[in-house]
Amino acid sequence: NLGYNGCTQGAHIVRKIKRTENINVPWLFFLNIDSSYADLHSRYQAIFDQGKELGIYVYCLYTDGDPEKLLPLIEHNPDCAMILLCNSAAITEDFAKAAESLNNMLIGVAYDDNTDTACLVLRDHRLLYSIYRMYTDTESDEILSGSYARFAEEMHCPFVTVLADPGCSASVRENVYKAVVGARVAQKYRTIPIDLFYDIERIGNIISPPSSIIGFKPDGSIYNIGSDGNPLEHNIFNESLRDILKESFSINQES
């Protein structure tokens, strides 16, 4: 799904829409989902359907609630590659057992005091998982020193991911990304370091530049910040994804 649907077939659709409609479609986007909704399928399936029409087959999902409630959505979209980010405390035996039948999902476990226990549960159930951590200006030392990647090695993670807190300075972000790329090129660890935002942007620039990174909050409002520094006023539950991208992510708009 990631290689063919996301980066080949989907990329072809993304490029065609850019060429014919001047809309800059991202190859991936983020959904922060409130798992307390009674019927997540009726609330979110239309978003996946709209995304696939635009060539988007890769989704990064996050919930600070119960990730097991998101599994039916993932199961209902077997042609998509799903990255499910969740808190380590939410990784239970019940969740792992329910996830065993899904083969289009990578589970991202938050880096904290319970990460090792969560990884052990997922490994016992033979699930694909990695760890991720959000860092600030004062929390980058473990990443730069390599201790975070070495911990991921011990957890048998194929990937070790970092993402910058919104308040993180540009200089720290750049230093972390240089360290991530350097370790990856040198194959320094038995895990592949990934900077989630920078690497998504890099792949997006290969598929169809300029890359756009967008996401939607639980209430449907958009994460992306416009070029003028003001939040974009869009809501995925009130507008179609195509209309949002056409209005605020068209080539003429961005230039």
Residue ranges and their predicted role:
Residues L2-G6, S36-L40, N114, E233, ...:
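Non-membrane alpha-helical secondary structure
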Residues L28-L40, G51-P67, N77-T117, L122, ...:
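Core AdoMet radical
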